[in-house]
Structure formats: structure tokens, C-alpha cells
Amino acid sequence: MSENMAYECLKYSNENINRALEALRAGKMIQIYDSDSREGETDLVIPAKAVTYTDVKWMRKDAGGLICVAVDPVASKQLKLPFMADLVREASKTSDSLGEVVEKDGDLKYDAHSSFSLWVNHRDTRTGIPDIERALTIRKIGEITEESLSGNGVRFGNEFRTPGHVALLRAAEGLLDERMGQTELSVALARMAGITPAMVVCEMLDDDSGKALSKEKSKEYGKEHGLVFLEGREIVEAYLLWAGTDC
């Protein structure tokens, strides 16, 4: 089934999903809440290729969490993006101190492993931290993701350097069949929307409590700013439908 055909089917299944896909296709921000039983966090989410410095400022000021880019698993393989934990494990062979700090089974209370890969800056940036420079790095990540999925031979190191100020998240190979984090949920939505599956995610934090912004407060924020609010279960249900041969 083509992406457009699947999208037409989804129009009749979940209007909230439909609105989110329309927003993403237009390069607009949405909200994704994973679940009560996982992180219990809401992220601001926007396609990487659509990001401007005002979007980075928006996420920095109103969300406050890490500004990361979730990358499709197929593109991650093409670009040879490693998991950060694997890099540290390899480095720990010559450094006992690294072996002590690397992520171990049971360390994470919400999942089996983290999705962190490299932290990068685009080579055209200076320090890489200003909003306008992070926006450039993010857009270029979107572009190289698209190029890699188009079969073009690209070398990630020609465009980017590490360490940097934008964290890459490598989506699980099985996507939602394997892991249901914001990384996989946002990439699944990108696939359904037929856009480049490189998505910016940023956790929403609460200035008053010092914790993650509650689901209720996140929804209120979304209403005030005209954002579509999706829960992880909605995305999982829609993705299973999209991935099927018919609907």
C-alpha cells in the first residue's frame, strides 16, 4: 500500500492521528505523550527538515528538555550511527573508569536501553549552541537522512563533527514492535505522514515542580498553542493499521 493510500484510510480511523499527520506534513509542531507506565512525559515534536531557529527557541524556552533528533533505523544503519552505550563499551576496553559508568542491564527504570547515539554539530557551525546554529545542524540531519534513504552514498562525517550540541537518537530496528519511546513514536508518525523520518523531540518540563510537565498541564499548553496532543497508544494503534496490507 502506498503512503498516500494508507493516509486516506487513516482519515477514517482516528481524527486525532489525521490532524497530527496533517500538521507534520505542513512542518508544524505537535505533542506526543508516551504513556503513564513508561516515562510519563510529553515531548514537543517537529520534522527536522522544517526546523527554524524560532522553533529551537520555542523548545528551549517552553519545553526545556534536551533537544534531540530521532532518526529512522534504516537511515541510522546507512549512516553508520552507533549507540552511545556501544561506543563507551568499546572504549572501556582500554579504560576501566568508562567500564564502570556505561549503561548496564536494569539501569533504566523505563526501558531496556537508551536510544542515544552521537552528539553532533554541523561543520558549518561555529560553536554549535546558538539557536540558529542548532537549527542548521538539525535541518542538515534531516537532509542527510533523506539522502541516505534515497540510496545516495553519503558520508556522515563529511557534514558533521562530534562532540556537538544536538543529540541523535537511533530508533530501534523493530520500531514500535521493539520499543515504544518518543524516538520510535515520532519516527513511526513520520513514516505514516510520508515525510523524512528524522524528528526533533524535546521533553516538556515543569518550572514549578522541577519534574516533567504533567499530562494534564501538557494538554492545557497544547490547547493554548493550537497543538495536536497524541498519546503513545494512539500512535501504536494507527501504525499497526498503516503497516498492514489493507484497512
Swiss-Prot record:
Reported cofactor(s): Mg(2+); Mn(2+)
Alphabetized UniProt keyword annotations: Lyase, Magnesium, Manganese, Metal-binding, Riboflavin biosynthesis
Molecular function terms from GO: 3,4-dihydroxy-2-butanone-4-phosphate synthase activity; magnesium ion binding; manganese ion binding
Annotated catalysed reactions: D-ribulose 5-phosphate = (2S)-2-hydroxy-3-oxobutyl phosphate + formate + H(+)
Pathway listed: Cofactor biosynthesis; riboflavin biosynthesis; 2-hydroxy-3-oxobutyl phosphate from D-ribulose 5-phosphate: step 1/1
Site entry (Essential for catalytic activity), positions: H165, E203
EC number: 4.1.99.12
Binding, D-ribulose 5-phosphate: R38, E39, D43, R179, M180, G181, Q182, T183, E203
Pfam families linked to this entry: DHBP_synthase (PF00926)
Coiled-coil blocks: none
List of residues binding Mg(2+) 2: E39
Cofactor binding description: Binds 2 divalent metal cations per subunit. Magnesium or manganese.
S-S bonds: none
Domain of life assignment: Archaea
Cellular component annotations (GO), alphabetically ordered: cytosol
Binding site for Mg(2+) 1: E39
Biological processes, Gene Ontology terms: riboflavin biosynthetic process
Family statement: Belongs to the DHBP synthase family.
Subunit structure of this chain's protein: Homodimer.
Stated role: Catalyzes the conversion of D-ribulose 5-phosphate to formate and 3,4-dihydroxy-2-butanone 4-phosphate.
Record-given protein name: 3,4-dihydroxy-2-butanone 4-phosphate synthase
Native source organism of the sequence: Methanosarcina mazei (strain ATCC BAA-159 / DSM 3647 / Goe1 / Go1 / JCM 11833 / OCM 88) (Methanosarcina frisia)
Highest classification ranks of the organism: Archaea, Methanobacteriati, Methanobacteriota, Stenosarchaea group, Methanomicrobia
